[in-house]
Structures are given as structure tokens and as C-alpha cells.
Regions:
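C-terminal, charged low-complexity interaction regions
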Residues: 79-83, 91-92, 358-380
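Acidic, Ala/Val/Gly-enriched low-complexity intrinsically disordered segments
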Residues: 4-6
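Catalytic cores of enzyme domains
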Residues: 51, 97-356, 363-372
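Short alpha-helix boundary/capping motifs
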Residues: 60-61, 143, 375-380
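Non-catalytic, usually N-terminal nucleic-acid engagement modules in DNA/RNA processing proteins
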Residues: 8, 12-111, 144
Length: 380
């Protein structure tokens, strides 16, 4: 046994140094693109310093040195059915479910294998929701309903909580830890990785795709070459198109003073203080004038005030009002996609339409613009 060990040691000394690979940022980015990502950026973990503990990814993997962000484009054509008012299934199915559940995890898996083959750990983090110790919607303590987990709430076997769990409870596993499952702000993490900026509508904007993408992340203890945060021409034009075309008036006016500001390692990120609960209701159910699946009579009747939020009877937008809306309207959507029932996309389509105009980051990307006629609105 001793001789074998010596022999092994000798052979290691004889290895050609050129055969030893060193994990690089380029290797990771090349692997990400080859696996199907559209863009990849890398940030040092130090950029997350100062984030609230319950949303700080540094707690996920304390030894991690690098955060790797991946962009997955939403094909503009996925929005075409809603833009024309003729097909509403493809957007939630492909742009939400397809990317978050299939395409992104596959890339995380492949890039993670590359990193671990080089001797470093790969902590993959796909999109999820309704798992943290604070609300996805307003950041308040405790779990609340989340559109990322909204699936057949009345028919699901575990409907006793918004989580689809029988009991909502979580606690730190050791002193100094945060309670599981820790979630962080994906869009700010993407900014940290140099992938883009936050627009007024709180959407992540990238120079290549405007608002048309989703993201996923990977954390590793490998020290890599890092990307600078975006510092080019502002991607958001502050044009107010997203404000005007939101059917629920969820986005404040540009000059309203209603803003959220975050200092991300010296970069100021600012967006409109969106009414997230109201947005939840309208982006999944669109409202009287933009949901062709719900009969006019249902809106008119507004039984038991279930649609007060959608009809403007109340300004109160919270979890209870959302549940009323879902209970009243979910049966009118023809089929589920195993994900939330996004039917709006008003802010995204408005943003694309403006960014495709002269001076926008999407100018010249397509032969023809997304919007070729006046946006539709039901007459009722």
C-alpha cells in the first residue's frame, strides 16, 4: 500500500502543468450560453453587503465568493397573443412556467456540474416563491400568498395555507442564522451581476432584451473575474408608458414622488412604489376591460363584493381581497398551466413598444414593431 501511495505521488509530480485547468469566468459564461442562457454576469458577494438579513444571499452559502446571474429571454412573440387579444395561454405557460421550471433549471444544472468538476461548490438557485419568512408582496414579516405559488387554490389538496402547507412555521436552525427558506431580490441581484437596471415599473431591463427576460442564479466559493454593474445610457426612458397602460393603475406616476430607492454597493437603484397586491390581482385577471374570459354579467353583478378591488369600489388591496378575486374568477380561465394565470403584461408590452422607438435600447432589434395598431380594449 505504501509503494502504491508513493507511485501515485510521483505520477502527480509528472503531470504537465498545461493540463491543469483553472476555472475562469469565461469558462462559466461559455458554458452558460452553450447550455441555453442568453446572458451571464458575475458579481462578488460583497455587493450584497447591507441587505436585510432575511433577504441577504450571503447567508445561503457563507463561504461563497461569487454570485453568477443568468438571463433567459422571453421571446417577444410570446406576448403576441395578448397583444392581439387572441391567445392567452402561451404567456404564462412559456414565459413563466417554461423558463422558471424547465429552461433555467437545466442551465443551472449544467453550469453547476462544470464548477463542481473543477473542485468548487455550486449552490444553484432557481426562481421560486412564497417560501420566505417575509411576504413576497410587501416584505412584511410572515408568509403571504404569492403569485409564484398560486396554483388552483380551491382544488389543491393542501389549501389550508397560502403556502399549500398544512402548517406554516419556520425557525432559524442555529444561532445567528436566518430562518429558511431564505429568498433574495432577484432583480437587484441581476443588477449586481451587471446584467441591467431596474425600470420605473420595477422590471429588470437589459440592453439586449428590455423587460423581456427572467433570471436565475448560482453561488460558488470560486473567486472569479467580476463584471462591472451597468453604467451606460439609462435603459428606462421614464416615459410613463407602463403607468398609462397598467389596467389597475398599480404604478405611480413618474413625478409622484412615490419611489423605492436602494443603494447597491454604490449604485442607486430606484423604481416606482408599486401597489404590489393590486398588481397581483390585475396581472393575473386583467380587469373588466382586458379579460375576455369573464362575462360582462359577472363584473356587473359583483356578487358579495368579491370584485370590489377590480371594480374600483375599494382602494384596499391585500391578501384577503386577492382571495376574493381568485375565488370569484378562477373558474372562468379555460385551463391552467401549472403556474399563475398571467393575462395582463400591460407594463411589459408598453415598455417594449417604447424601447423599440428611436433612442430606446431595443431600437432596430426587430424588422417590425410589437405594436402595429391601437391597443385593444373591450367595450363593456
Amino acid at each position: 500500500m505504501q509503494k502504491e501511495a508513493v507511485g501515485c505521488q510521483t505520477s502527480l509530480h509528472n503531470i504537465n502543468q498545461e493540463d491543469i485547468t483553472v476555472l475562469t469566468s469565461k469558462m462559466i459564461k461559455d458554458a452558460a450560453i452553450a447550455a441555453g442562457a442568453d446572458k451571464c454576469g458575475i458579481a462578488p458577494m460583497s455587493r450584497f453587503k447591507g441587505a436585510p438579513d432575511e433577504m441577504n444571499p450571503q447567508f445561503l452559502f457563507p463561504e461563497a465568493k461569487s454570485c453568477i446571474g443568468f438571463v433567459f429571454r422571453i421571446p417577444r412573440g410570446v406576448q403576441r397573443g395578448i397583444e392581439e387579444g387572441t391567445q392567452f395561454y402561451q404567456y404564462p405557460s412559456m414565459a413563466y412556467g417554461g423558463i422558471n421550471e424547465i429552461f433555467a433549471p437545466a442551465v443551472l444544472y449544467q453550469v453547476g456540474k462544470l464548477i463542481e468538476d473543477e473542485g468548487y461548490e455550486a449552490f444553484v438557485y432557481r426562481n421560486t416563491g412564497a417560501r420566505g419568512v417575509v411576504s413576497d408582496m410587501d416584505g412584511s414579516p410572515g408568509n403571504t400568498l404569492s403569485p409564484e405559488e398560486q396554483i388552483e387554490i380551491n382544488e389543491n389538496a393542501k389549501t389550508s395555507t397560502a403556502h399549500h402547507r398544512s402548517v406554516q412555521f419556520t425557525r432559524p436552525t442555529r444561532e445567528g442564522n436566518v430562518a429558511p427558506d431564505l429568498q433574495f431580490q432577484f432583480r437587484l441581484a441581476a443588477v449586481a451581476c451587471g446584467l441591467g437596471e431596474i425600470g420605473w415599473s420595477k422590471m429588470l431591463l437589459t440592453p439586449e432584451f428590455g423587460p423581456l427576460q427572467r433570471v436565475a442564479f448560482l453561488f460558488t466559493d470560486a473567486e472569479l473575474e467580476y463584471d462591472e454593474m451597468y453604467h451606460g445610457k439609462p435603459l428606462c426612458r421614464k416615459c410613463g408608458a407602463c403607468v398609462r397602460e397598467c389596467p389597475g393603475s398599480c404604478i405611480p406616476a413618474i413625478h409622484s414622488g412615490k419611489t423605492i430607492s436602494v443603494d447597491l454597493d454604490g449604485k442607486l437603484c430606484e423604481w416606482g412604489d408599486i401597489d404590489m397586491w393590486r398588481c397581483y390581482a390585475f396581472y393575473t385577471h386583467a380587469g373588466r376591460f382586458y379579460n375576455p374570459f369573464v362575462p360582462k354579467e359577472v363584473w356587473d353583478a359583483n356578487e358579495n363584493g368579491a370584485l370590489d378591488l377590480m371594480e374600483g369600489v375599494t382602494d384596499v388591496a391585500n391578501e384577503q381581497e386577492i382571495m376574493k378575486v381568485y375565488t370569484a374568477l378562477q373558474k372562468y380561465f379555460p385551463s391552467w398551466v401549472g403556474y399563475n394565470m398571467a393575462k395582463c403584461g400591460g407594463c411589459i408590452r408598453a415598455c417594449v413598444s417604447m424601447l423599440e422607438k428611436k433612442g430606446g435600447c431595443m431600437e432596430g432589434r426587430f424588422e417590425a414593431p410589437l405594436r402595429t395598431k391601437k391597443a385593444w380594449k373591450l367595450d363593456r
